[in-house]
């Protein structure tokens, strides 16, 4: 038990804290605000408080809880909405109304709800950390596997029969090698700053299919990969992340709204229950965990929300699921680090950010990955992290963007000009990159199309050629270009408008399956080959531009039937044959 001696914003200094540990959770003041010790000097402790500290004064008590900041992991996580320190917002609303009272806590998982438990082990079985004790159908999409906590191993001496239990009831007893008995419930706690263990890390060879053509074809994200979406305000970071949360082929989505506007979380809450998962036909909310830590919530909790989210994601990974984690936005978290570092009077680094910004960002992204999980069976799970970065004024040379680019392998650079032109997703194809292309091309060749890489590279080269030609057009106008280059501009316009641009509000075009993506690409590249042949045979470029098939190619993105899209190849060939006859080529 200590006493407060100083309060500066979210930081509180207390003395008489002998015996306290780093990162221990404490209750601050008479109201009992939740805080975490971030520095110890002698018997003084510096505490960052996760709630508003107005009204707290020196002399009030500080009480240690003996545990570090931990999350509860068990059935009840999915469809829930938490704040940055895993307090269920729905429950807090029932306790204190629309405005959250300070010092309030509620258990993260519902204590009175009964879950139907089916055991998967029997008495006498040997178990190790990560083994599946039983399963609970948490939602109609996700079967929640109840795991043996990583620190437990031994022999099952008692296991609950199939039936309905609450998370507080003991469902198994394990006799450890030293003879002690460990009682296991459906949930366990895990400190958020410690990454959950696994057996082995696997290379990221499987793409995370998002249904967004720009991303899947040109700048692919791998399962277990890391990606950053930097962009100025209004360029579509949040909308892009919502699209990925909706349609990516991860089985579980953890969405962290970290320091962004509250109405963006409201959008998720309103849209996701109405939207259907394309694979199961069930509401998307049933596979989603939301962590809302909006811009008007206390600054210190932003850091906690990032760690809370990734720990929950690792827990579902350990069950053998592919998890996608969206962090929107990591810049706000970095700003919180800057504010707390300033109040700690630490030496500032670049632009006032703390010198350890790079290592903090790296520490977060390193928890992504595709792994073989703990346990006797060889389960494979993954956590793919997609972090939005909001640099002030869209300046990509800013420290948060630069330090993020050092650790992530995929960079989707959003462009305000494209966003203004209503080009969605506004990912600039000349500035973005993905370092996973070589690793995942085998998957595409085996499962979708053996020519995927060749087509992708051809299209990319065309788009880069277009950028060079645009420079010339700006100076001397399009009429000065030779026919061959005019023809390239026709094809690249088709690539931009009919392939890269996507309609997030159209039922068909919001999600484009891999087979359709490859077929659309083939249609456009076939048009390109025929165009080049026509130009070489002396057909005027204006005639090519007027071909009726061009309009059909422009509409193919709204066509759900892949065979009808494929039929455009024959139609293109036929119309070019007629042109060749007309011009005697």
From Swiss-Prot:
Pfam family of the protein (one): ATP-synt_ab
Topology of this chain in the membrane: Peripheral membrane protein
SMART domains per UniProt: AAA
InterPro entries: AAA+_ATPase, ATP-synt_VA_C, ATP-synth_a_Xtn, ATP_synth_asu-like_sf, ATP_synth_asu_arc, ATPase_a/bsu_AS, ATPase_F1/V1/A1_a/bsu_N, ATPase_F1/V1/A1_a/bsu_N_sf
PROSITE patterns found in the cross-reference section: ATPASE_ALPHA_BETA
GO terms under biological process: proton motive force-driven plasma membrane ATP synthesis; proton transmembrane transport
Annotated GO MF terms: ATP binding; ATP hydrolysis activity; proton-transporting ATP synthase activity, rotational mechanism; proton-transporting ATPase activity, rotational mechanism
Stored SUPFAM superfamilies: C-terminal domain of alpha and beta subunits of F1 ATP synthase (SSF47917), N-terminal domain of alpha and beta subunits of F1 ATP synthase (SSF50615), P-loop containing nucleoside triphosphate hydrolases (SSF52540)
Known EC number: 7.1.2.2
Main localization (coarse): membrane
Residue numbers binding ATP: 231-238
Reaction(s) catalysed (UniProt annotation): ATP + H2O + 4 H(+)(in) = ADP + phosphate + 5 H(+)(out)
GO cellular component: plasma membrane; proton-transporting two-sector ATPase complex, catalytic domain
Compartment(s): Cell membrane
Root EC class: translocase
Keywords in alphabetical order: ATP synthesis, ATP-binding, Cell membrane, Hydrogen ion transport, Ion transport, Membrane, Nucleotide-binding, Translocase, Transport
Record-stated family: Belongs to the ATPase alpha/beta chains family.
Function: Produces ATP from ADP in the presence of a proton gradient across the membrane. The archaeal alpha chain is a catalytic subunit. Component of the A-type ATP synthase that produces ATP from ADP in the presence of a proton gradient across the membrane. The A chain is the catalytic subunit.
Assembly mode: Has multiple subunits with at least A(3), B(3), C, D, E, F, H, I and proteolipid K(x).
Protein's name according to its UniProt entry: A-type ATP synthase subunit A
Species per Swiss-Prot/TrEMBL record: Thermococcus kodakarensis (strain ATCC BAA-918 / JCM 12380 / KOD1)
Lineage of origin: Archaea, Methanobacteriati, Methanobacteriota, Thermococci, Thermococcales
């Amino acid at each position: 038990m200590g006493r407060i001696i100083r309060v500066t914003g979210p930081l509180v200094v207390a003395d008489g804290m002998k015996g306290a540990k780093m990162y221990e959770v404490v209750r601050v003041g008479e109201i009992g605000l939740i805080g975490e010790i971030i520095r110890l000097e002698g018997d003084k402790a510096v505490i960052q408080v996760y709630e508003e500290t107005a009204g707290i004064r020196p002399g009030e008590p500080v009480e240690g809880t003996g545990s570090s900041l931990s999350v509860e992991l068990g059935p009840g996580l999915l469809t829930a909405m938490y704040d940055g320190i895993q307090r269920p917002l729905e429950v807090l609303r029932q306790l204190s109304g629309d405005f959250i009272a300070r010092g309030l806590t509620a258990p993260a998982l519902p204590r009175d709800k009964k879950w139907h438990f089916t055991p998967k082990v029997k008495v006498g079985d040997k178990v190790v950390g990560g083994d599946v004790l039983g399963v609970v159908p948490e939602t109609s999409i996700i079967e929640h596997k109840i795991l043996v906590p990583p620190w437990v191993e031994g022999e099952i001496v008692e296991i609950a029969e199939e039936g309905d239990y609450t998370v507080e009831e003991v469902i198994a007893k394990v006799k450890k090698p030293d003879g002690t008995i460990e009682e296991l419930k459906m949930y366990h706690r895990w400190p958020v700053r410690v990454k959950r263990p696994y057996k082995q890390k696997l290379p990221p060879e499987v793409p995370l299919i998002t249904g967004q053509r720009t991303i899947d074809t040109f700048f692919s994200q791998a399962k277990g990969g890391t990606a950053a979406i930097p962009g100025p305000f209004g360029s579509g970071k949040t909308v892009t992340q919502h699209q990925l949360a909706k349609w990516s082929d991860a089985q579980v989505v953890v969405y962290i709204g970290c320091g962004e506007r509250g109405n963006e979380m409201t959008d998720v809450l309103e849209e996701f229950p109405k939207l259907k998962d394309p694979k199961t036909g069930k509401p998307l909310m049933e596979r989603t965990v939301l962590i809302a830590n909006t811009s008007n919530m206390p600054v210190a909790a932003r850091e906690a929300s990032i760690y809370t989210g990734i720990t929950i994601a690792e827990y579902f990974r350990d069950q053998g699921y592919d998890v996608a984690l969206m962090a929107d936005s990591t810049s706000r978290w970095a700003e919180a680090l800057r504010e707390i570092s300033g109040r700690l009077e630490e030496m500032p680094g670049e632009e006032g950010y703390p010198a350890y910004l790079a290592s903090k960002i790296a520490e977060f992204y390193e928890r992504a990955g595709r792994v073989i999980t703990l346990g006797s069976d060889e389960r494979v799970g993954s956590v793919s992290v997609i972090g939005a970065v909001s640099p002030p004024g869209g300046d990509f040379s800013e420290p948060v963007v630069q330090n993020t680019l050092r650790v992530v392998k995929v960079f989707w650079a959003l462009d305000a000009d494209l966003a203004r032109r209503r080009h969605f997703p506004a990912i600039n194809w000349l500035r973005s990159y993905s370092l996973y292309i070589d690793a995942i091309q085998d998957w595409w060749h085996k499962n979708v199309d053996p020519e995927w890489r060749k087509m992708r590279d051809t299209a990319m080269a065309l788009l880069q050629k277009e950028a060079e030609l645009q420079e010339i057009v700006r100076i001397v106008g399009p009429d000065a270009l030779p026919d061959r280059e005019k023809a390239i501009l026709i094809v690249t316009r088709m690539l931009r408008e009919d392939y890269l641009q996507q309609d997030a509000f159209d039922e068909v075009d919001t999600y484009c399956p891999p087979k359709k993506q490859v077929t659309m690409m083939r249609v456009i590249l076939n048009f390109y080959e025929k165009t080049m042949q026509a130009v070489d045979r002396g057909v005027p470029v204006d005639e090519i531009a007027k071909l009726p098939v061009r309009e059909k190619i422009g509409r193919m993105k709204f066509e759900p039937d892949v065979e009808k899209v494929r039929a455009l190849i024959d139609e293109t060939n036929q119309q070019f044959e007629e042109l060749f006859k007309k011009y005697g080529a």
